[in-house]
Amino acid sequence: TFAFNGGPGAASAYLHLGLAGPRVADFGPDGRDGAHARMVDNPDTWLAFTDLVFIDPIGTGWSRTVKPDDAKNFFGVRSDAQVLAKAIALYTAKNNRTSSPKYILGESYGGFRAVKVARALQHDQGIVPAGIIAVSPLLEGSL
C-alpha cells in the first residue's frame, strides 16, 4: 500500500503516526495532551495485512528538489501524478514486488491525487492498481 497525504505541505507522517503505522502518537485519553504525547505500539497497524510505503511528494514533509527552482516542475496535477507513478514503479521493480497487488491510499487532497496516480500507473507504467483507499478525500474542489 502506497500512502500519501494531501497538500499543501501535509506530510505522510499523519497517516504513519496516526493511522496505519506500527507505532502511533498517543495524546492521552482526551486526545489533546500534545505536551506529553508518547509513541506506543499500534494494535491496529496495517502491517498485519499489507506492506506500507509512505511517500511525501515534492513540497510535502521533508521532500524537496535539489535545486529549489526545479520544484515548480512537480506542482501540476498531471506531473505530480506521473512522478508518483514512476516512483511506485521503480520501488516495486527494485524490491521485487512487481507481482504484488498495489493499493493507493490518499488522505484529503491525497484522495484526489490517488485517482490521478492510479491512472498514471495504468497508462504510463503499465501497472494496474488493485484498489484505492480514500481517507477523508477531497472529491470536489477548485484547484
Regions found by a protein language model. Name each.
Residues 1-73:
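N-terminal cap/lid subdomain of alpha/beta-hydrolase-fold enzymes
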Residues 5, 105, 133-136:
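Alpha/beta-hydrolase-fold catalytic nucleophile elbow
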Residues 48-51, 99-101, 128-130:
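Loop/turn elements at helix/coil->beta-strand transitions in domains of secreted/extracellular proteins
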Residues 57, 130-143:
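Active-site nucleophile loop of the alpha/beta-hydrolase fold
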Residues 73-85, 109-114:
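Phosphate/oxyanion-binding active-site loops and adjacent basic polyanion-contact surfaces
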Residues 90, 94, 120-124:
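Active-site catalytic microenvironments for nucleophilic, acid-base chemistry
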Residues 96-109:
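Alpha/beta-hydrolase fold nucleophile elbow
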Residues 111-123, 132:
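Short glycine-enriched nucleophile-adjacent loop
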